[in-house]
Amino acid sequence: YYEQLQYVGDTRIQALVSLYMTGDGRLMRNAIEQIDSSRTAEGATYSRAPSRLQQYIPTFSLWWIGMVHDYWLYQQDAGLVASMLPGVRAVLSFFAVRQGSRGSLGRMPWWNFVDWSAQFQGGVPPIENGGFSALLDLQLLMAYQWAADMEANLGSPGLAAEDREQARKLHTAIQALYWDSGRRMYADTPARTEFSQHAQALAVLAHMVEGNAARDIVVRTIEDADLVQATIYFRHYLHSAMNLAGEGDRYLDMLGEWRAQLARGMTTWAESPEPSRSDCHAWGASPNFELFRTVLGIDSARPGFRSVVIRPFLGKLEKVSGAIPHPQGEIAVALERRDGRLHAEVSLPQGVTGQFVWQGQAKALHPGSNTLVF
């Protein structure tokens, strides 16, 4: 059981596992504070904290902003989130001085790790000599979007407007630099010779494409074997894009790697595909919460989990049930296909409302017991 360092990319996923399985946000809060404390004068965080050795992965500073945003969505602790906004601003300033006139990032220092895909050298995706990487630009775009959301609600409306403008500018640059109209996908660099599942997943999550266009790109991303394939870590982001685009019914069919680990007798999840070992690895544990968020469909619809959206994707399952802890109690869901209809029983904590979405239909949920038929 190998991995013990608190790497940011790993920890963001592990924090969601902890919230969905225990509801206890204390470890997540502690991680957010420790990573914030590792920031340099330039604004970047360590790749892992605490650590006696300095190591920097710029993209992990962006995922830290994502962690703060996740905490805001799922925990009722706005004070902690507000206290992290100076750190969020510092991280974005580190990236802002490295953005070119169009908004795209230039050459970045340190280890620009994204995933362990075989075609990525040392985990680093293709980057042109002057910079220009769709994967880095898309992660920065998401960070600006998260920051704008938090600033507008808990911080400075003026800074929220600045973040939105940075996001708009970067959105335009990404579309111009990386969109390949012939292949109808986002390339990894402006040369448009290399394409990855990573770029398409991030484009969907960053709202570069939405609606039917997002669904189309997700389907082709899953089915196109010529794309650089996401490995265990980045499969979480591919699965999240599937869910967002409405293709969550494919999720259970995407778990072959995890089934193979069980067949090999591994007792904890691995970091990467074979050759591997049983790492007890945080990012490999993403199905532990995705089964609740995608299959049962339970997610936060407002900061503090004060409203819930339940949008299940059963795949081939006929019957499924489960429950997750919530800051105000428990959310329980039981679903069954019967006589050509979906029968749903949903229990929400007192004071929590929401919406149940099934195949384009939406029905309101109220506190307590809800019985629905679609």
What are the residue ranges of the model-derived segments?
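Active-site acid/base region of carbohydrate-active enzymes
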Residues: 1-46, 73-138, 151-200, 305, ...
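Short, solvent-exposed loop/turn segments at the edges of secondary structure
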Residues: 9, 59-62, 66, 111, ...
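Alpha-helical repeat scaffolds
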Residues: 213-222, 252-255
